[in-house]
Amino acid sequence: MKKLLLLIFTLCAVHVTFSQEDTYPMYKGCENKQDVTLENCFNEKLTADILAAFNVPQELISNNYKGTVNVIFLVTKEGNFDVLYVRTAYKELEDEARKVFGNLPKASPATYNGRPVDIRFGMPIQIPLGSQPTPKIIEKVEKQQEIIYEPTAKEDITLITKNSMFPEHTSELNIPFTHSSYADLDYYFNKGENSHTSSKPYLFSDATNHIDLSELKTALFKNKTSKGGKKLWNEHFFSVQKEDYWFTINPMVDLQIGKDNSDNIDFTYNNTRAVQIQGGIGKNLNFSSSFYESQGRFSDYVTDFIRANGVLGASGTVPGRGKGKGLDQGGFDYPIAEAYLSYTPNKFFNFQFGHGKNFIGDGYRSFMLSDVASPYTHFKISTQFWKIKYTNLWMWLDDVRPEVSVNELSPRKYVAMHHLSWNVNKRLNIGLFEAVITENESNRGFDIEFFNPVIFYRAVEFTRGSEGGNAIIGLNSKYKLTNNITAYSQFILDELTVGRFFDGSGYWGNKFAFQLGAKYFNAFKVDNLFLQGELNIARPYTFSNRRSILNYGHFNQPLAHLWGSNFWEAVAIARYKKGRWFGNAKITIGQKGFDENGLNYGGNIYLSNDNRIANEGIDITQGNFTSIFIGDIQAGYVVNPTTNLQFFGGITFRNFDQATQTSTISQQNTTWFTIGLKTDIFNWYFDF
């Protein structure tokens, strides 16, 4: 009886009133009921039949699983029960829900103005059956037209989150961007309609339209009764939730120790201690702040990169993090802070201002905007309506090379960019991209003309003159072959001389890059097996400029692909998880042309392309030809799914074979083994 009452209550969460010309759907056994009595009978009979027929898999029962199977369904104008969407972390539960609804008896349809119409319901099936529900799905009824269900519509699903264990899940905060976690998210985004996946990181509030994040995490919870056990294995370290505000505090670590095959150091290590504070004030404003205190000693080839990329007032650039101060015995000290404010005034706009990273694209790499460089100050506007998502991004960047400093200060430069994502239909997405890089000319800061969010920057750059900036345009696309397979691409154009493009001369000024890739979710019908393949090619001198400060880079690192330009690269990735256990494997092969004998062959975006080797005969991998192979294998265990604290171990094989060895880059064969404990909330890139 309790099970009946609970599901009846949730079915009736929104009361629907029908006029005399309207009738509610009539379920078997309710033929003699009318008006409100008919509605109550429908809810009671339907609930009873669903509970009687629903069988929870024995494995979940044995594991004391608790969760919700949220079902969105239609009672069609033909009287059939048509399941539109099932949201659950387990395919077995989804299959069971679809089977139960598929076997329900035919009902008499609802009517409006005397004609049959579709009516939509939302029902949470609580596991164990009859347990007290925490979230409730609110039904939405369309009476004047047939319903086309789009899981992205925010009003379709409303979760009650007061005193939730995960207040961030319904906030306007960013989901931390790591390739491993986003491989899981993208599967659910791709299953839905009208989803946009190229602009990252995603907002939690957007993700909840496609996936029940709370259920995914609670499914991994350990049965702990002590407060310490819950904090270690399941929950936020500290959390406060009130009616008008909330915040969480979590300590974070990245503690690693390892060994490579060099004789220069006894062992490698990373020692990061950090704290993250996140919260919300009211319904529309959220904040996040993270501070990292880090020391590390890396494999030889990473140390060579750090020291080769000098920084004013420091020893070098730690990849993806920033300024590194040298320590004894080859280590580096590299503190960093990241923070942002996120404000969402309505369902169309989100505004963010902060210090961090962004990513535009659907691949492992990106030629539009990647997260390989250090964090930067930025202001972002995200606009979403109809089938459009429009992203504006303004970035404050630094050229930290000592040789370009003025009065011991690093020159400032700016990037204004926008990206338009358009869902052409249910399968095809097309994106348009434009960015312009300018310098701090006459110390006047960001040119006000570039704050126009809808202007074409290339035209502004043209009117300001050839020295006014460096513009880049691009096109990306994604095609959903099935719910499990997607193909994606990017094309970036830095400069083009049309008359020289097809003449076969290899003209240097035709600077472009492109990407082709595919993703396969639940590959070969193996749950949670993810496969990805990707090809990246960049012409020499792409992303560079005659004035090096106007290159597409920040803090000695590219804003696009980690390898800069003048290369081709192929990447193959496999990921698998089972409960809290996970494994990742990645193979990278490629060829790149490096500079030699003081000549600029087009691989270093920080060199002026005025010093190019020639105007014609420019080919990919020209210069000091280098073959690169990198194999990376990692396995681990998620200690806390709420904070993504992980224990892991991994091994990296790297073969770097140059035609000619130089003083800065030498031929190396590296085997690097690491184990550690880390809070996995950002990407490390050592595949260069």
Please name every model-derived segment.
Residues L5-L6, T17-I148:
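Charge-biased low-complexity segments
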Residues P105-K106, P251-K259, I651-R654:
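Generic short beta-strand segments
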Residues F73, Y85-T88, M123, L129, ...:
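A mature extracytoplasmic/lumenal domain signature
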Residues E155-N429, V436, N440, D503-F512, ...:
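Outer-membrane beta-barrel channel domains
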Residues E21-V36, A153-S171:
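Short N-terminal segments immediately surrounding and downstream of signal-peptide cleavage
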Residues Y334, L428-F688:
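Exposed, low-structure sequence patches enriched in small/polar residues
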Residues Y65-G67, V117-I119, Y269, D333, ...:
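Residue-level preference for beta-strand/loop junctions
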